[in-house]
Amino acid sequence: MHPRPMFARYFVEVPLSPEAVAHALARDPRVWLPGLAERANHGGDLLLAEVGFGDVVRIKRTVVVELGDSVRSGSTIVFPLRWVASSGAGLFPSLDADLEVAPLGPGRTQLAMSARYVPPFGSVGRVIDRAALSRVAEATLKDFLDRVADTILMASREASRPSEHGGAGVRLHEAG
């Protein structure tokens, strides 16, 4: 019997066109996405400590985030995303998600993340997940997506300002 996945979803509105958001997401994601995931992951670790899982937090872990090529489905652009712990992998679930870019109207986009993960430790892990860890996963997902949206907005603002050389320039980097 295969373990049943848990689901989490979060979305944020971005005051940019879907094309601008999708372009920003696809622009060097290996450069800027991992840092955002690390920060969101750290926030999740702090929440784990608050709900009584301090021993888990003491395990130093980093995450690897992979963003796949986009696929268009009607007016929605979907990027497959995978988030895995690069250390302590058996203690932490991997997360598979769809990062969705959908129009909300002129110059407005819904950036959403629909995620699936299987809690570690079988049926015991599912009970623990229902008791507290699912809320930590949701908070981490929210933190990550908010950081992605902030980074895209910051890059858009930088692109609209003239650079020193007379043209507009944009560079995606991690938002604080």
Describe every region a protein language model picked out.
Residues 6, 10, 86, 126-133:
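Residue-level detector of alpha-helix boundaries and kinks
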Residues 118-176:
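A conserved amphipathic terminal alpha-helix motif
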Residues 20, 89, 119-121:
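Residue-level signal for secondary-structure boundary sites
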Residues 25-27, 62-64, 94-96, 124-128:
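Surface-exposed beta-strand edges and their flanking turn/coil or helix-capping segments
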